[in-house]
Amino acid sequence: MAVSSHVYPKAQENIAKKAMNLSTDSLKVMLFSAYTFANTHATITDVKGAGTEASGTGYTAGGQALTSVTLSTSGTVTTLTCANPAWSSSTISAAYAVFYDAQGGTDATNLPICYWDLGGTSSSSAGTFTLTINGSGLVTFTAA
C-alpha cells in the first residue's frame, strides 16, 4: 500500500514560534484505526477527537517514543529522521500514524507534527508492526 505523509500546518507555526524543538523534545508516534485530518488540529486532543486510536496486544495508548532522532541541515534542506518505529509481538490494526511532540506531557499540550495515511489498514498478528521511515527522512523543510 502506498503511504502518504502530511505535515500539520500548525506544526510549522509551532516550530517558528519555538513552541516545539524537534532536536531536543520527546517525539512519539501513535497509531489510529480511523482518523479524519483537519488543518485546524493543533493538539493531540484535537487529533484524538477526530479518530480512533489503535489498540491491541503490544500497543500502549499514546504510542511509543521515537528513537535515534536527528535533525540535520544540508544546504537549504533540514531533515528530521528517526529509527523505524516497531511494536514487537503485537496484534495491531492501523490505517494512520500520527507523529507528535510529547514535550507538553498531556494530550491538550502535546503537538502534532505530521501524519501518515497508510493507504488502508495494516495489521500484525502476534508479530512485529513496523512503520518504515523514508530514506529521505520523516519530515523535510526547504528554505528558498
Q: Where are each of the predicted segments found?
A:
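Small cysteine-rich, disulfide-bonded extracellular modules of the LU/uPAR three-finger superfamily
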Residues: M1-A95, A102-A144
